[in-house]
Amino acid sequence: MAERNEQILTPSQLNALARDLLEGSFPLVWVEAELSSVTRPSSGHLYFTLKDARAQIRCAMFKPKSTWLKFQPREGLRVLARGRLTLYEARGDYQLVLDHMEEAGEGALRRAFDALRARLAAEGLFDAERKQSLPAHVQRLAVITSPSGAAVRDVLSVLARRFPLLEVDLLPSLVQGDSAAAQITSLLQRADASGRYDVILITRGGGSLEDLWAFNDERLARAIAAAQTPVVSAVGHETDFSLSDFVADVRAPTPSVAAELLVPDQRELVARVRRAQARMTQLQQHALGNAMQRADRLALRLRAHSPQARLQLLHRRQEEAGRQLGARMTQVLERLQARVQRGHAQVQSHNPQRHLAGLQQRLRALHPQAAMQRRLQHDQLQLRSIARSLEAVNPLATVARGYAIVTRPADGSVVRSAAEVAAGERLRAQLADGSIEVRVEPGER
């Protein structure tokens, strides 16, 4: 066999090179054509052919992309498809793997939608900073939608089930057709200007891009952005997006979800109220217990400072003072008696008669009678003088003459001056034959 300088390839190698060339040379492409040979096996994938009058290309749309289609693919339907070129190596088939497909009439609308969305986004109409928050408790709601569509039934059903107390005004409008956008815009502006509503809901059910086109109107988008009342947009299904969704304060994927966002579930509210009541009862019981404890402490303090308790305390103090006074008086009397006894002993020791007897004995010892007589007279005079001096200082003598010794019962001190006592003060007066208690009366000193 002759030697060859060219590289020799196997079919699989050649198909792999061709696939790499196709996938690397062509970006994401859009194709408008007619559907043919449509099949959907049990795997959920979608296989068909796109053709025009002169050519055709095999196409595949794998699950789950095929499940999001908004229409039913059928023979002869004209579509706008987007995908990437590739090569199925096992058969060498050149094909287009799609990730999006819509009916062909929507192509121009899609391009217009993308252009307007980009322009409004550049103006900042979609910015989160300009969007308003929904009120915590919605009391009045305006619903702009078709009065006969499925959307209004879904919304009203959810609202009635979750929160029947909500006041809802249905503002009927066309939601499809040439005049729908202007009518929705007018109703929105009037509802916002009235100041009556807490939230305005714009909604309708699903449909094609053309069916939903009223909600991509530029005037409606700008009216939503200018509204002072928070606006919720719930247009179509979860996969549908309109300009009203982007510019609204809140976008809900479906009308039912919008209703759930706007009101709480009354069952959850009841549960929350019950929890709050239980908590309030617990707090009340705790507060009542604390108040009762404080009341008990105050009652104890009041009893401790009540007049009766005060009188009892004063009575105990009076009894104690009486005991102390009695003890003091006893001590004072004992001291006075001791002083009297000492004075009596001193008087007895200086008794003139005893002294006179001694002198007489001494006189008898003296022989000159005259000298003895003079000496005796002199001594008698001295004795009388001493006796008078002793009698002058004898307390018993003073008491015996009708005087009294006045002392304070509390400490036994002797009162020497009227200036030392006060009106009403109780004193003790010691007399010759006993003692009496006296009280100082007001008067001149």
From Swiss-Prot:
The keyword Ribonucleoprotein does not apply. The keyword Hydrolase applies. InterPro entries: Exonuc_VII_L (IPR003753), Exonuc_VII_lsu_C (IPR020579), OB-fold_nuc-bd_dom (IPR025824). One of its GO terms (cellular component) is exodeoxyribonuclease VII complex. Keywords: Cytoplasm, Exonuclease, Hydrolase, Nuclease. It catalyses: Exonucleolytic cleavage in either 5'- to 3'- or 3'- to 5'-direction to yield nucleoside 5'-phosphates. It comes from the Bacteria. Its main location: cytoplasm. One of its GO terms (molecular function) is exodeoxyribonuclease VII activity. Pfam families: Exonuc_VII_L, tRNA_anti_2. GO terms for biological process: DNA catabolic process. It is found in: Cytoplasm. Its EC number is 3.1.11.6. NCBIfam families: xseA (TIGR00237). Bidirectionally degrades single-stranded DNA into large acid-insoluble oligonucleotides, which are then degraded further into small acid-soluble oligonucleotides. Heterooligomer composed of large and small subunits. Belongs to the XseA family. This is Exodeoxyribonuclease 7 large subunit. The lineage of its organism: Bacteria, Pseudomonadati, Pseudomonadota, Gammaproteobacteria, Lysobacterales.
